[in-house]
Amino acid sequence: DKDEVWSAKPVIYLYPEEDEDETCDAKPVAYLYPQTETEITVRLDYDGELTCTYPAYADGWTVSARPDGTLTDKNGQTYRYLYWEGVSETEYDFSAGFCVPGSGTAEFLEDALSKLGLNRAEANEFIIYWLPRMQENAYNLIAFQQEAYTESARLTITPEPDTLIRVFMAFRPLTAPVEIAPQALTAPARTGFTAVEWGGAECR
């Protein structure tokens, strides 16, 4: 069904939808960068159904995190980030955003993700995942979500990070350009223990 919202499911590293449509929160990944090696617990309060987590979520994730972002679980397994995917009925906000030609997606995302606070490695992983789903479209209507996402997917991180950056992109493929008010993109300075999350949803 072309009206369904979907996402591919690999590996936390709008026009109003019809009521019967689902929204897939695609590949939210979370990175943890403490100042010293620290045991950290991450819990997710999600207004929807989790469909996949890695490592296994259970009642939360507890890992030992290093300043370089390496995460180690109780069994000694290491991870680059925490991953989850879920399905919800969240209505994303497309009152402001960007209409971007598919051919200009990579350049747009490089600039936007930097303004939103992702470092080069994080932005690279974001772009590698999303670019194949966007560059062949004639245009993409893109809006980076604030409360619509953060209020439906609430994170509790213990100990609490000094800096929390959450980047969530909703986009809709278009066959022709549309006018939309531009969105202001800002980010806090990355100081102290920093936690970063990125994800997205493709809306059809």
Describe the role of every protein-language-model region.
Residues D1-R204:
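Protease-labile, long low-complexity intrinsically disordered regions enriched in Pro/Ser/Thr
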